[in-house]
A protein has these predicted regions:
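Unchanged
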Residues: 100-124, 132-188, 204-205
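Nudix hydrolase/Nudix homology domain
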Residues: 1-32, 38, 92, 163-206
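N-terminal strand-loop-strand
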Residues: 55-94, 122, 126
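Acidic, metal-coordinating catalytic segment for phosphate/diphosphate chemistry
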Residues: 29, 33-72
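Extended, positively charged loop/linker patches that create polyanion-binding surfaces
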Residues: 96-98
């Protein structure tokens, strides 16, 4: 129920932002701003995060609200083990990746994140999955997020930590450490192993 309520509030926020973007009436603008302020206060009560911290996130992309894109690199070492990085922020593990960057293609982001987080040069090859974070029942956050999982081929197997990672490693399917759930679920990792074994061929799409 909490996640459902959270998503409804985010939808209200998005509609208010779209209204502000297109409104030509002072009256309508004031009403959309009031709706925005009310939804911020509800988010504050739901999350216990102060309004002054929520507001900059909401206002970051004022205008027609669209989903943010999170890109994850899927790398195997040729021995059936997948590359994971340990995040400094929560000390849990995830596929290398992060937000899509303006000026970078999805392939470029996957390659860049692998090198920055795991010290590994890779060549992005093809898309494996496109997931809707809400549909996947992942922990809620302010942004509405799509996740792209991109298969990458490594130039080697030597890996090293980056500025945002505590550790990096290659893991078998039965060796998966505690995962950073806002970034990936265990079901996502198992799906990537299915692709590696050839048990899945078509792109997964939410």
């Amino acid at each position: 129920m909490a996640q459902s309520f959270f998503e409804l509030i985010k939808r209200i926020q998005a509609l208010a932002e779209i209204g502000l973007h297109y409104s030509t009436s002072t009256y309508d603008t004031e009403r959309y701003e009031e709706i925005q302020e009310i939804s911020l206060k509800i988010l504050n009560q739901l999350t216990d995060i102060p309004v002054e911290k929520i507001k900059p996130v909401i206002e970051e992309n004022n205008g027609y609200k669209t989903p943010k894109v999170d890109i994850r690199a899927v790398v195997f070492n040729g021995e059936g083990k997948i590359l994971l990085i340990q995040e400094k922020v929560d000390r849990c593990w995830a596929l290398p990746g992060g937000w899509a960057d303006v000026g970078y293609s999805p392939k470029m982001v996957a390659e860049k994140e692998c090198f920055e987080e795991a010290g590994l040069k890779v060549k992005a090859s093809h898309l494996l999955a496109v997931m809707d974070k809400t549909a996947q029942k992942m922990p809620p956050q302010f942004e509405y997020v799509y996740k792209l999982f991109i298969r990458c081929e490594p130039s080697g197997t030597n890996i090293s930590t980056g500025s945002e990672t505590l550790d990096v490693g290659w893991f078998g399917e039965n060796e998966i450490p505690e995962l950073s759930l806002p970034r990936n679920l265990k079901s996502h990792i198992h799906m990537m192993f299915e692709y590696d074994r050839g048990e899945r061929n078509s792109v997964y799409l939410d």
